């Protein structure tokens, strides 16, 4: 393996790990216990890292005049594969799906609680306020239900 490809592989691995750990669903989780590692999260990390690989080649070309066609092509192909994996949810099992849905519901709780506490629109519109409170309650209930299903 040549130096440039080894370097790109290290960059890709770092970007993949950052993509998984700093995924918005994880950052916005209401509780740390609502964060699970799932295939969908891995697919998202692959999507982020592969897009960074090919877009890095474009930036590198614009700023320095160098372009590696092979790395660009591999990045594009990995992006296409990751889109396919995300859209089809290939290999995602019942438990994998539940793990991702818990994070999704937890994000809804975080954003709803924040908007309810800081936003006059929610408190001045009784319909919207009721909807938000119901959503908060239902998401909590569904998270408990899904966590029980995982056990």
Task: Cite the ranges covered by each PLM segment.
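His/Met- and acidic-residue-enriched segments that coordinate or traffic transition-metal cofactors
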Residues: 1-151
């Amino acid at each position: 393996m040549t130096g440039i490809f080894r370097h790109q592989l290290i960059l890709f691995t770092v970007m993949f790990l950052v993509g998984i750990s700093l995924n918005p669903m994880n950052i916005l989780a209401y509780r740390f216990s609502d964060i699970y590692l799932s295939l969908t999260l891995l697919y998202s990390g692959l999507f982020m890292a592969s897009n960074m690989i090919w877009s890095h080649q474009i930036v590198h070309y614009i700023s320095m005049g160098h372009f590696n066609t092979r790395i660009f092509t591999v990045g594009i192909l990995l992006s296409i594969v990751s889109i396919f994996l995300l859209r089809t949810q290939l290999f995602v099992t019942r438990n994998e799906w539940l793990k991702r849905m818990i994070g999704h519901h937890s994000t809804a709780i975080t954003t709803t609680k924040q908007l309810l506490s800081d936003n006059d629109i929610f408190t001045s519109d009784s319909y919207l306020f009721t909807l938000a409170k119901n959503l908060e309650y239902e998401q909590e209930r569904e998270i408990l239900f899904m966590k029980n299903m995982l056990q």
